Amino acid sequence: HAFCTGKYLREVILPRLNKGLENSGRRREDFEISGGGFVVTGADDEAVSKMFEWVRMRVGFYGSTPSYWPVFEQHGWEDLGFKLNDLSKKGQWEQMTNEVSDDIVNEFCAVGRFDQITDKIRRRFAGSVDVIAMPENTPSDLLEEIRQIGRSL
């Protein structure tokens, strides 16, 4: 799921996954991990900024749901989940988005223009996931470049 930070992935999900694989006698190579956050990218800074704001809204929306609060808890953001949940019950959707800081949004995504995103993806996802979802407007040559690094993620 995209509602996942690098810290939550490394400190909670991967250890649990590795224990499950060990208990079942399966190898990590036989299992594919998809996701682990959002990829925020575009041709220029304006496009990146627009997508960043969309992710802010998604984090506010998902974060209002108690099922997703363990991610917040891993960062010490428990109060944010309660606040977002309260705002959702009041139908204050815009205020929910406003409660999510830039720093929090950045924990959930790799951010950069098309000419920067490969490095950002490598830093964010290396050693953690096998497959990531890219925005639909990503140029095909960039997708191929990311596919190549994906083999070494």
Task: Give short role names for the model-derived ranges.
Residues 1-153:
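Active-site-adjacent structural elements that line small-molecule/cofactor binding pockets in enzymes
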